[in-house]
Amino acid sequence: MISATATAAFLAAAPASSSSCTTHRRRSGLPAISASLATASSTEEPLLVRAARGEDGLPRPPAWMMRQAGRYMAEYQALAKRHPSFRERSETTELIVEITLQPWRAFAPDGVILFSDILTPLPAIGVPFDISDSKGPVIQSPVRSEEQVRELTPIDFEKLRFVGESLKILRTEIDGQAALLGFVGAPWTIATYVVEGGMTNTYTNIKSMCHTAPNVLRGLLSHLADAISEYIIYQVNSGAQCIQIFDSWGGQLPPHVWEQWSKPYIKQIVNKIKIECPNVPLVLYINGNGGLLERMTDTGVDVIGLDWTVDMADGRRRLGNKISVQGNVDPAFLFSPLPVLTDEIHRVVKSAGPKGHILNLGHGVLVKTPEEAVAHFFDVTRSLRYDTLFQGCVTEVLEPVA
């Protein structure tokens, strides 16, 4: 494990930095990534970043897994016994780095995603939370009034230094051999926790606010969109090369309601990032997005993640091939015989086509997933070659379904 002393020494020795986003970001006081990390030609960039941008001529699809660092790994379980608090594990630089690197060392995925949580930035905007073993996240004072929205603060990065420090260390540790991913929650998804006070199966409070207190909800979502935008820029300036936006509970909304209450705030974020950090690909993942695919295309993101309930070939037809896709092997296939998993990987890759595809699961890795299956997933992906899989095929230009 990387010690606190080693962490401090690394950060003290970090070179002078220059922003990887547009230069006028300097006025915001956000930390900036070092020039050595910011300048790389397309051919030097990680495979995942190039696939996210939809570049031609890649040899194979890159692969990573949502929740690839975590509870299914024996190494993580041993660490969690020594550090039983999830908040400690996800808010301590040396632990974040160690946990993030565990699957990288074991399986060498093409993407290494920061070990964190979508709720991590909440205390930095004035919303404290706890995590209960039985209930999950708990927010003692749910935000449901105009006065409470006014009390929210601009995001304070002094309270998130562990995120920036971890990303800087990870970018150096990975050393260009994979893409470093950061992530955020979408405003609607974060708001579900803030309004409901934690996890919920019904979303009745926040859904009713759409009608009973729409101005309060708009104020909350707008504040979250601003904070999340700044948080993305902070992650990019600390070393993240690609950002995934999780609208985990957007799929709990009827499509027309998602269009009104989630999509505009995602677009607000994307528009700002495309101005401030135009070279950083953005991935949008919504669990249960089969009814939303066509509505997701004009959010401005570079990649749309598909969950496993959407057939990849159908998803590609509906989205067209001018936008990249991510996914979407059912996590349960990792419990199947390895030849079955191999066949499913081949099916998904062939369905996605030879361009603009990041192989992933359709959801996070399940708790008891065999590590052997995870290793096999990445071994198979590394063995793939587009020129063999699509030999003699002519790529059809697909326009998104209107």
Curated annotation (Swiss-Prot):
Cellular component GO terms held in the UniProt record: chloroplast
InterPro entries referenced in this protein's UniProt entry, alphabetically: UROD/MetE-like_sf, Uroporphyrinogen_deCO2ase_HemE, Uroporphyrinogen_deCOase
CDD domains per UniProt: URO-D
Record GO biological process: chlorophyll biosynthetic process; protoporphyrinogen IX biosynthetic process
GO molecular function, one term: uroporphyrinogen decarboxylase activity
EC number(s) on file: 4.1.1.37
Catalytic activity: uroporphyrinogen III + 4 H(+) = coproporphyrinogen III + 4 CO2
Protein localization: Plastid, Chloroplast
Coiled-coil regions listed: none
Major localisation: plastid
Protein name, as recorded: Uroporphyrinogen decarboxylase 1, chloroplastic
Organism of derivation: Oryza sativa subsp. japonica
